[in-house]
Amino acid sequence: MITRYTRPEMGDIWSPESRFECLLEVELAVAKAQAKLKIIPEKAYRDLKAKAKFSVARIDEIEKTTKHDVIAFVSNVAENVGPSGRYLHYGMTSSDVLDTALSVQIVKASVELFSRFDRLETILEKLVKKHSFTLSAGRTHGMHAEVTTFGYKLAGHLLEFRRTRGRVERAIDQMKIVKLSGAVGTYSTQPPEIEALVGQTLGLKPEGIATQVIPRDRHAEMLWALGMVGAAIERLSVELRHLQRTEVGEVIENFTPGQKGSSAMPHKKNPISAENLTGLSRLLRANAGAALENVALWHERDISHSSVERVIFPDSFILADYAIERMARVLEGLFVDETRMRKNIDLSQGQLFSSQVLLAMIDKGLSREEAYKIVQRVCHDLEPGDSLESRLIADPEASRYVDKSDLKKIFTGEKQKKRIDSVLGKLVRGPAKGRAKGHGKSEGRSAVRGKS
């Protein structure tokens, strides 16, 4: 992955140096197990442990001749060890070390990835608590629907990220696999006990039945889980992009001193981070598709998967890590315009409460069809400057079924806030500690009564 979208901490894990370190870690764990079972001399293991080292430049040099990177790696390490080097890679095939080393890399990468999840969830939790009662327009089909709160909206994303994290955790658990069963998975060159011992050393589980490789359904699940990270990131990114449109203006990404939005238009403040994350999410999903293509290999293995995985595993982990961190920064610096949210609610002149008026009329004895017809008529007859509440009071037919006291209860939004408080308390925040502070009235006449 290009450095622009790489956090150094994650990039280091997927560097060539780190990859070969993981290969060497596997090779030494195998030699240790073989020495324990007296398959190789104890002195050979001690020599390997003391002298094994590699040079990426030397490996690249050898590979120009061998056209095989694992052989080049083994040759380089062996030449540094001396006579005992002949016991390096003893009884192994290349995929034994490659697949097991990839498992080791993924476990290391997961530590960084989950630290980013922790940070993102913490920031989201703070925003949910802060804006639990910040009323905003809920939209369906891009149109005003009913009142919600900004905190409630974000709480849905928080829970989605928690589910996504769970998917990643389960996928990583499925990738904690050691495979040392040889060229076609039959343990022809060393016993299964070696695999078990190495698994204990590395914290991995033996594959039940392998071919030359670990079955690629595991890898596909891993990349699918990272693709779901992209999907969760994109859903929130798209929401933030819509809310930042000039006509909406409910949130604004942080704009730092000296930052510029356009080479031609000095006034521009664009949602560049949310747009960037939308694009990166496409790559994560695309890589998941490529991983699915790798599942069906020929017989006991071909190498059609290899070139793909050299790209998609580093790229997907690096991108997911970067995307989570960038989203955390977006939310950390996000300006939430509560006044604009209130004004946007007022654009609908109180119609966001029409469903509650409908139910109030039904409770007074009207059929649903009759009540719907009355409320729809009053809504569609609203003129500029009107509010649904005032027109219902003035309408002879509607006022027979809902009076001022009924409407006052509806148009404060208190019912939504109480129920939202209950839901957030159970799912997100833990037990509620009193009511959140109210927000002041917006300028001019508001379609929402009282404080919110």
Predicted feature locations:
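Alpha-helical support elements that line or immediately flank enzyme active sites
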Residues: 32, 105-117, 226-235, 240, ...
